[in-house]
A protein has these predicted regions:
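Active-site microenvironments in enzyme catalytic cores
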Residues: 4-6, 38, 42-199
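Gly/serine-rich nucleotide phosphate-binding loop at the start of the catalytic core
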Residues: 2-51
Length: 199
């Protein structure tokens, strides 16, 4: 199921379900996917089930929403300082020459590795544990808070100090930490990330 956050023709924020043909049906009583996720947790049901029950006949199209730049990011916290953009090197194994040089050195004696490379190796070796086993916390990176996330079609501004600025397509996992500190997966989205592999 594909869901989006968008601005309706009347200017109001909406959540919509996108069909295979690009038709967007508005979800009744939902203005953000964050609200939907919280409600589904409280009701102990899947977001999909809630959407199926509340999909309306009010329609829009993806083509029009994109052409008129009415699309929002798929998920956001109402307080951007409570939203974290981060990742792990384990999902970027071949994204940069720096990773390739790390792989070449992994066969060395662990005592000769830098702390960063040790963490990378620990993550490779034990970062994806079997069910009910505790794994190694993988190497990870922090990109910023919710203020760093831009809506689709929004301008990406490159810093003046960039050495090799560029964009990378990313597959993003969207997670929410609930009131009991349980991590809940909301879904996945495509993203366009600014990166600088030289700096």
């Amino acid at each position: 199921m594909r869901i989006i956050q968008f601005r309706g023709r009347d200017g109001a924020r909406r959540v919509g379900r996108v069909s295979d043909g690009g038709i967007v049906h508005t979800i009744r009583g939902a203005t953000t996917t964050y609200e939907l996720a919280l409600e589904s947790i409280k009701k102990r049901t899947l977001i999909k089930n809630m959407i199926d029950e509340r999909v309306t006949e009010e329609k829009d199209t993806m083509d029009q929403i994109l052409a008129e730049k009415r699309i929002y990011v798929p998920f956001h916290h109402p307080n951007p300082y409570h939203q974290m953009v981060s990742g792990t090197g384990l999902s970027h194994l071949g994204s940069a020459s720096a990773r390739n040089s790390m792989h070449a050195k992994l066969d060395q004696d662990e005592a000769s590795l830098t702390d960063s490379m040790k963490m990378f190796k620990w993550g490779l070796d034990g970062g994806k544990p079997k069910t009910a086993e505790i794994g190694t916390q993988a190497e990870w990176f922090y990109k910023g808070d919710g203020d760093w996330v831009k809506d689709p079609e929004a301008e990406l501004i490159w810093p003046t100090y960039a050495l090799d600025g560029g964009e990378e397509v990313e597959l993003v996992g969207i997670y929410l930490i609930d009131e009991t500190s349980t991590v809940r997966r909301v879904g996945y989205a495509l993203a366009n990330e600014y990166a600088d592999h030289v700096m």
